[in-house]
């Protein structure tokens, strides 16, 4: 719970989450549970001696790549459709409790496929979790297939082709493509051909850029057709590019606690929330990999409020822009915008 007088307002504010990796919702207790269920041996090192030791280690990441090592080890416990469904359901319950009404979630099939897990097992499990969230919690959900930059392009191409062969984009089992993992090092345009193919088919595109990499990584992602930028905090270093992002209504999916935990910023106050608001940059606030970074979406909202002391009107702008930048139909957008307006009006009437 944040210390701000606006905590109850922030808790009840209808939220959209656009930047959360389902594999990043593998809490230590679930990792140990699934490892036991699936007879998976975890590494013989101090961090994996207990749930408590792993939780402690998660609070001391030194970089993006340090985090990614633990992230990919965690994935190794996921074997069966029910494992993926349980993981998704665990996230959606927490998101719902934090006031999320719509969630667009990443999944990383390449890493699982390299472990011998069939693509269909992965997708079927996550779809089951999404359907349960829609049925029992009233959330709307979208799955975004996420390429990883530390694996070869032909590896991503095989997964992309599987999704096409199963018509997952046409029948909206999968609603878009993204990329993530190591930012600095691999070629900025490594997915050029895949993004060109997807763009020609009308598939929605997003990309992790401008987290550790400089603004040129954002420019490269936009040039390849990205319609959203995940992270994007280094956009402020290029005023001309920032003007373009504002003009073209490109939404950033900002993850404040993640940026802090991975040492991208020295404090939440260094995340350019105020600069984005003043410049008119569209952005949403998200949790990224909440089980690893110790904060789900409400924790991120509270951290931003404690750092910036935003007004109700500023939060309204953030919430409304998060809806406008969502990959949902106009009817659902109108419904969610109405919920925000109702919530704001109730708050104003009560103070």
From Swiss-Prot:
InterPro entries associated with the record: A/AMP_deam_AS, A_deaminase_dom, ADE, Ado/ade_deaminase, Metal_Hydrolase
Keywords attached to this entry: Cytoplasm, Hydrolase, Metal-binding, Nucleotide metabolism, Nucleus, Zinc
Catalytic site positions: 211
Primary location recorded for the protein, binned into one broad class: cytoplasm
Pfam families named in the record: A_deaminase
Chain sites annotated for binding Zn(2+): 19, 21, 208, 288
Reactions it catalyzes: adenine + H2O + H(+) = hypoxanthine + NH4(+)
Entry's localization field: Cytoplasm; Nucleus
Assigned GO CC terms: cytosol; nucleus
Keyword Iron-sulfur included in the entry's annotation: no
GO molecular-function term, one example from the UniProt record: zinc ion binding
Documented EC number(s): 3.5.4.2
Cofactor, free-text remark: Binds 1 zinc ion per subunit.
Site residues, Important for catalytic activity: 231
Enzyme class: hydrolase
One of the GO biological process terms: hypoxanthine salvage
Cofactor section: Zn(2+)
Binding site for substrate: 289
Keyword rRNA processing tagged: no
Family under the similarity heading: Belongs to the metallo-dependent hydrolases superfamily. Adenosine and AMP deaminases family. Adenine deaminase type 2 subfamily.
Function: Catalyzes the hydrolytic deamination of adenine to hypoxanthine. Plays an important role in the purine salvage pathway and in nitrogen catabolism.
Protein name: Adenine deaminase
The encoding gene: aah1
